Amino acid sequence: MKVTLIAILTCAAVLVLHTTAAEELEAESQLMEVGMPDTELAAVDEERLFECSFSCEIEKEGDKPCKKKKCKGGWKCKFNMCVKV
């Protein structure tokens, strides 16, 4: 009886983890679609620009240059802005 219960709970946990991973992959693939509208791409670009600029402003100390935070997805922080690599 205990073995059956453990097996059922294990299968349920694996199913939940698998479903979550599949949903994440689906969301990523939708972002990477070639036919993605320009408005959605612009929103992603603006978000990265804001995130990078904001993090540089927080990390700036006096007249030292800001510490460059790694931007994700082929972007880098330069002159308090995210630029494509």
UniProtKB/Swiss-Prot annotation:
Pro-piece positions: 23-48
Disulphide bridges, residue numbers: 52-66, 56-77, 71-82
Organism, as annotated: Cyriopagopus schmidti (Chinese bird spider)
Expression tissues: Expressed by the venom gland.
Summary of the function given for this chain in its UniProt record: Lethal neurotoxin that blocks neuromuscular transmission. Acts cooperatively to potentiate the activity of huwentoxin-I. This toxin is active against insects.
Signal peptide annotation: 1-22
Protein name according to UniProt: U1-theraphotoxin-Hs1a
GO molecular function: toxin activity
Subcellular location field: Secreted
Family affiliation: Belongs to the neurotoxin 12 (Hwtx-2) family. 02 (Hwtx-2) subfamily.
Top-level taxonomic group: Eukaryota
GO terms under cellular component: extracellular region; host cell postsynaptic membrane
Keyword Secreted recorded: yes
UniProt KW Ligase keyword: no
Record's keyword terms, sorted: Disulfide bond, Neurotoxin, Postsynaptic neurotoxin, Secreted, Signal, Toxin
